[in-house]
């Protein structure tokens, strides 16, 4: 007969108890009442937070946006085709966040920071909340360093500083994206990290931008966040916040960043779609009441940090599309009131061959000359004044038949100055080249040339100055001032090049 030893049994029981490690935890769950159009209504989820991530049975993730008395409105981050009525949903206890690291540079990702360029996973040890509070008043300092775009019209008359928010606004097909991509190209060697966020764009347009950046070697300091037109509205709404979180990661590490939102009209439309499907009351143009807050909390994250926080910066260039030049629509007026100025692109100028088609008259920068180097201030003031007078005169000259010689000269000068502002796409100019170009125009050196010869002469002058008078560039880059010595060098170069140019044209 087998004897039962009590100590053995107690040892076995003790071992089993020690091995038992099943965790007891409370899971907040709910049931799907209704699903469709990227929205799910959930019964239950009693303790869910606003903005919390929830997980459906088949793996889809959603965000709890509407917390009502008897159900929860969830927006889906996917098509949700496999979700069925009655299936279970559990709250994750997390707010939307993304991984962040240096490894994102040069990659194309979606709104959930997953790579979509087919080049493998991205390693990241840290994460940041997609929606994080903007820096407070004490954490900021006023904008004082220039962020050069490489476009004469902007850098001389509508300057942008590091930490500023400057809106690019205009009709479709007026070159808004071109201005933004040229600005990215011009950051080469400036130690600025660029983030380009494409919201609701055609996939072919995004591919074109990425190709341009790759060909020009700009992808190594750029991250592209893309949610194309066929993406769910939730992801189009989230994409700008994902871009901002990535830019903030670098900003708080004492780096300078530039972020482009292309474009916020599409984000507002995606948010309107979500809100209407969630049955939130519509307001003006059927947008929900909090559409202003949608953009203000995004754009307020752009800042120039104080010296205590390392003086990093995040410069935002949001893009907004207008319908036939109507700047007084809801989204344009909202974003104009949030930003520190706007660059207005006109379809009429674009069609007249003036590209970039910047309407200097109604474009402003509320930071102004604080975001310019001294040398640019010295030459740009005169350009602004002469162009403003030219626009007035041109309107007047349409009605007057006989104009005196002085007026004719002023009109001729204005036409050449307008010609000088024209630039090819993807050909940004350095500050030194811009200063030289503006000085040549405002001091009458182009007056004797035909309008058709102006651009050719300026291109040749830039090459001549670079090869024969390299000291000019050195003086301006080291002193940031247009000194008498620099002026003398420039005058000599203009005279010499003009003589050569006249002989060439005669031949």
From Swiss-Prot:
CDD domains linked to this entry: ATP-synt_F1_alpha_C (cd18113), ATP-synt_F1_alpha_N (cd18116), F1-ATPase_alpha_CD (cd01132)
Q: Which reaction does it catalyse?
A: ATP + H2O + 4 H(+)(in) = ADP + phosphate + 5 H(+)(out)
Q: Where is the signal peptide?
A: none
**Site entry (Required for activity), positions:** 363
| EC number(s) from the headed UniProt entry | 7.1.2.2
Amino acids binding ATP: 170-177
Write the record's keywords in alphabetical order, separated by commas: ATP synthesis, ATP-binding, CF(1), Chloroplast, Hydrogen ion transport, Ion transport, Membrane, Nucleotide-binding, Plastid, Thylakoid, Translocase, Transport
Cell compartment(s), UniProt:
Plastid, Chloroplast thylakoid membrane
Membrane topology is: Peripheral membrane protein
Q: Name one GO cellular component term.
A: proton-transporting ATP synthase complex
Q: Name one GO molecular function term.
A: proton-transporting ATP synthase activity, rotational mechanism
Q: What does this protein do?
A: Produces ATP from ADP in the presence of a proton gradient across the membrane. The alpha chain is a regulatory subunit.
Q: How does it assemble?
A: F-type ATPases have 2 components, CF(1) - the catalytic core - and CF(0) - the membrane proton channel. CF(1) has five subunits: alpha(3), beta(3), gamma(1), delta(1), epsilon(1). CF(0) has four main subunits: a, b, b' and c.
Q: Could you say which protein family the record assigns here? A: Belongs to the ATPase alpha/beta chains family.
Q: Which PANTHER family match?
A: ATP SYNTHASE SUBUNIT ALPHA, MITOCHONDRIAL
Report the protein name in the record: ATP synthase subunit alpha, chloroplastic
List the lineage, top down: Eukaryota, Viridiplantae, Streptophyta, Embryophyta, Tracheophyta
